[in-house]
Amino acid sequence: LEINVDLTPIIGKGFSKLLALGAKNTFRRLPMTSRRQVLQGAAALGVASLAPAIHAQPKPVRIGYAMARTGPWTGGAQVSQEPNYLLWAEQVNAAGGLDVKGVKRPIELISSDDRSDVETCVRTYEKLMGSDKVDLVLPPWGSNANFAVAPLANRFGYPFLAPTALSRKLIEMKLPYFFLLLQQPQPMTNALVDMFKANGVKTIACIYVDDLFGLENYAALKVALQGSGIQMIEEKSYPSGVKDLSPVLRAIKDKNPDAFVGFTYPPDTILASRQAKEVGFNPKFFYASVGTAFQLYRNVMTPAGAEGVMGMGSWNAKTSPGAKAYFDAHVKKFPGKEPDRWASGHTWAGLEILTAGVKQVGLDRKALRDYIANTNHKTIIGDVKFSGSENIATPGTVSQWQNGEFEVVWPTKLATAKINPNKPAWK
């Protein structure tokens, strides 16, 4: 009996070469029992030779998060945060994995839809950190969600680098594991008022959404206005999910302020802009908040219609070589979808900080927290340094749509373009 078996897939090329060099003939002359023993031994040898390779495969770094994929938070979450998480994981894995103190390990993202619901968000993070015991977490979108999950960061000992939360109350809670990447309400409104003063504004009107974000920014604006010589001649709150702002805008138009300020979310930002155009309200300065920095705003309003509109923004592709590389990579992965010119950059900066921290100290979360808290970080948006939970290195900024780009116009040391102090007519 002659048995012809290709053992290469089992025992590797080396053993197969021995057969080719003469062992094959000897094998044929062996009794059947001996042949079986040779085959069994060879198979065992092959498995043993594979064992080191199997054991050498590094465990993935499991990183969990909840993100709005449905509900009213979706517009912000799916522009400013989740695309950046996906891009980061893809880039890191393509480079061999996350560097954990010199060992490259693949990233495994574990995520779910928080449905724009605070309770769902809290339950998800409790599970991720409490029972799933993921290695790291990434934050959810928005001030309300982050306010709810921030205490969990401290309870479970997981560093959070939050790129879309504005809240002085979060800073005052003194949570050592929670870090806010965005400029907070006071520096942002201080920059806005400084810009107004430098350009001769005497009167302003303000509307604000009646939630944590709107209330804190409105309060910060009132503080910033003290001693400025600028008078607030109208101030109105509105409920989340508002569908019509035209009565408020008509009343403001009648008072003819030099500047309009809206502490608004993306749907309200677009609503206020569209309805201001409809009622013919076109002050010298028109400033809205979240969403103004989005490509969506330019697309909906058209580049000509967005021209001169100001809002919360802090970077664009001109800010740094790293910012341009990030912008180009984002557009390549998500064709036709640009990162927004505010929180997207801060999201990426947070991922840069996390990457550098894990490389330096590994996955020891206490050591990682200490690294984040005590390091002056170099990022695409510039230096980031924390005092407590607050990023104190990134100054307040104002941006403005000019020729299809959301340009940083204040302060002048960070400007990517000169300010246009007279908004053109809506188009």
State the predicted function of each range:
Residues G12, N25-M32, L50-A66:
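C-terminal segment of N-terminal export signals and the immediately downstream linker at the start
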Residues F27-L45:
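N-terminal secretory signal peptides and thylakoid transit peptides that target proteins
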Residues G64-W88, S112-V118, W141-N144, I207-L215, ...:
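Extracytoplasmic "Venus flytrap"
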Residues P83, V134-K236, K284-M310, A317:
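Extracytoplasmic ligand/sensor domains, especially the bilobed periplasmic-binding protein
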Residues S273-W348, V358, T412-T416, N420-W426:
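Extracellular/periplasmic periplasmic-binding protein-like sensory domains
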Residues H330-S344, L351, T355-W410, L414:
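Segments of small-molecule ligand-sensing domains
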